């Protein structure tokens, strides 16, 4: 379990009272002042799904893969991560011992990461041992970075690696070449899309593993025949997109380009013209010709920012409803200002500190990912 400084939880109530009444102009000025005082001792990392009034203060912005690389390379003493819990954990795992990682809101979690806990994973591995004789020799565990530090540690200890939506293809290919089977968790949709669309593994060689059922809900024979075991997890945002939404856009605008994130269901990715990570989505649309129209299947803050940054194009969400990552949205300018001004005063609040034993094993999985992906 990740350790959060106990005093940060109590101080949070004071933060709400002290900062809630400030205008956005006051907050912007105070954040800028705090950043100037901290100088090179500080780096603020901002995920693409953060709201505009937070991400504008980031020194570096990116997707989970890019920010993992940034966290590994930065020389700053303080890493303030405007993202969600598992991202801050990864920054702490990859960072130096003398670096401090801070998450402005310690309740900013990830429902997908919560769908795979370490106790369930250990039970699943025991079942695979029972069925296959030696899970270690037969199954390569691969975890999406959207997972807890404890899950990453388990994967690292058992020879596996992490992946992101940017590098899932080379990681899954690596796993396939080393062991006859792989266990991909916690996002079944990214695993299925990568294995099927990128590596050509037949869908009938994949099983969705329900960790709440014995043997994942399958017979031992079916498990022995399978090549890819997909953990029954998903992203609550990307699961909201539907193939019917894409068809509706095409009926209204036959010229529309559809680009979606691989966390969407296979039905959605099959209907799209382009599929890729947030970094891929941004690059593709930024480089698209003026006058083009795009329907984007990812979190609404990024979709809106793409339209703002590309006024010569028409950019809409695939969904008729706002698909918002509510946990990303928990981080606001008030909390960012609070943690920065505390740092100026020499106080560290909301530190994310992964226990050493977990950190060492989890680093194996993250370092393997970076090595395989070329960073």
UniProtKB/Swiss-Prot annotation:
Q: Does the keyword rRNA processing apply?
A: no
Q: Name one GO biological process term.
A: 'de novo' NAD biosynthetic process from L-aspartate
Which SUPFAM superfamilies does the UniProt record give? NadA-like
Where along the chain is [4Fe-4S] cluster bound?
110, 235, 325
Which superkingdom is the protein from? Bacteria
Q: Where does the UniProt annotation locate this protein?
A: Cytoplasm
| Annotated cofactor note | Binds 1 [4Fe-4S] cluster per subunit.
The chemistry this enzyme catalyses reads: iminosuccinate + dihydroxyacetone phosphate = quinolinate + phosphate + 2 H2O + H(+)
Q: Where does iminosuccinate bind?
A: 47, 64, 144-146, 165, 261-263, 278
Leader sequence range is none
Gene Ontology, cellular component aspect: cytosol
**EC number(s) recorded for this UniProt protein:** 2.5.1.72
Q: Keyword Iron: yes or no? A: yes
Q: To which pathway does this protein belong?
A: Cofactor biosynthesis; NAD(+) biosynthesis; quinolinate from iminoaspartate: step 1/1
Give the protein family.
Belongs to the quinolinate synthase family. Type 3 subfamily.
Q: What does this protein do?
A: Catalyzes the condensation of iminoaspartate with dihydroxyacetone phosphate to form quinolinate.
Name of the featured protein: Quinolinate synthase
Q: What organism does this protein naturally occur in?
A: Herpetosiphon aurantiacus (strain ATCC 23779 / DSM 785 / 114-95)
